[in-house]
A protein has these predicted regions:
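Conserved N-terminal subdomain of the carbohydrate kinase-like
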Residues: 51-137, 309-316
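Structural alpha-helical scaffold elements that stabilize or flank donor/cofactor-binding regions
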Residues: 125-126, 186-187, 220
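Short, conserved phosphate/pyrophosphate- and ester-handling motifs at nucleotide-, phospho-/glycolipid
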Residues: 45, 197, 261
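Conserved phosphate-binding/catalytic region of the ribokinase-like
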Residues: 1-7, 155-156, 207-316
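Structural motif
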Residues: 5-7, 129-132, 193, 226
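Conserved beta-alpha-beta core of the PfkB/ribokinase-like small-molecule kinase fold
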Residues: 132, 138-216, 235
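Glycine-rich phosphate/adenosyl-contacting loop at the front of the ribokinase-like
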Residues: 1-77, 316
Length: 316
């Protein structure tokens, strides 16, 4: 038996959010919440009873402590996080946006210690004592050394027989489409379950067509066991060893949007860890809706809430 069900690594961040009705350049208050795509996935799975670990490199100080408290508090093993005596935390600022203005993200994550990681930073014997390694394109995008570390982790996990989950999660503010393809495409023959939206499939991997077409072509071209593709509000598509399936997306009121995609990935991986990705997508659709109901990148929930009916009634 492995020590973990899922391990992952990424940059620990702090999100600073402008209150609705204000702009970053003129606001007087900001809401502070810990953030990080990989940590969000590990945190959601930990709340569902999975054994998860997250690795990173963070400085000493209150902001790093705030991050650690958030994810340790929901059960994520943070013993593989490297604490450094100096350095800074990665930040990002968000304006939620109100029509006709879109939401806007401003990154402030240059010169962090995490950007300096190499394959030698982490103890892979410990981190790869797991059923699944989860990696994202966000971490690969930061620097050449983080891309090298993601590549090493995937190759070493594959060599050891560990299943690999990859979320392309393309961010145009972090790297170009060409560089994303250069780094990520060579990893795909080692990946078991791929999360790639229709738009990411088009931009990064050269696909074309509607959601079902892109989803099916990704699975066929790269010979993946499972491909899960979101297409904004149009739906979710699955192709893989469980066949092909389309899932509708139910629009819900939004309190806070960041983290909902990570919550979907985490819910889907909960099913994958039980050998049922289709059931997992159902969980993911549920958890991503719950993510939109409260502030913060990390979705807070209990296992019972996976089955709770969607309602505005009071549960008494």
């Amino acid at each position: 038996m492995t020590t973990y069900d899922l391990t992952t690594f990424g940059e620990a961040q702090i999100r600073l959010t402008v209150e609705k009705g204000n702009r970053l350049a003129t606001c007087q208050q900001l809401r502070l919440t810990p953030a990080g795509s990989e940590a969000n996935v590990a945190g959601l799975l930990a709340q569902l009873g999975r054994r998860t670990a997250f690795a990173s490199s963070v400085p000493q100080g209150d902001l790093a402590t705030r991050f650690m408290d958030e994810y340790r508090g929901v059960g994520v093993d943070l013993s593989h996080v490297v604490r450094t005596p100096d350095g800074r935390m990665a930040l990002y600022f968000m304006e939620p946006g109100e029509y006709p203005l879109p939401a806007k993200v401003t990154y402030d994550r240059m010169h962090t210690k995490f950007r300096e990681i190499t394959p030698e930073t982490f103890d892979w014997d410990a981190l790869l004592d797991t059923r699944v390694l989860f990696v994202t394109g966000i971490t690969a995008a930061l620097t050449d050394s983080t891309a090298e570390t993601v590549t090493y982790a995937v190759e070493e996990a594959h060599r050891r027989g560990v299943k690999i989950a990859l979320d392309v999660n393309y961010r145009s503010l972090l790297w170009s489409q060409e560089r994303a393809r250069e780094v990520l495409e060579p990893l795909l023959d080692k990946v078991s379950i791929l999360f790639c939206s229709r738009l990411d499939g088009i931009k990064v991997l050269g696909m074309a067509g509607d959601g079902p077409t892109v989803n099916a072509e990704l699975q066929q071209k790269y010979g993946l066991d499972h491909v899960v593709s979101t297409d904004q509000v149009a739906g979710v598509y699955y192709s893989g060893i469980q066949g092909q399936q389309y899932f509708t997306v139910e629009p819900v009121p939004v309190v806070d949007r960041p983290g909902a995609g990570d919550s979907f990935v985490g819910g889907t991986l909960h099913g994958y860890l039980s050998d049922d990705v289709l059931a997992g997508i159902g969980y993911g659709l549920r958890t991503s809706k719950l993510a939109l109901t409260h502030h913060g990148d990390l979705t807070h929930l209990s296992p019972a809430e996976l089955e709770l009916p969607t309602s505005t009634d009071i549960v008494r």
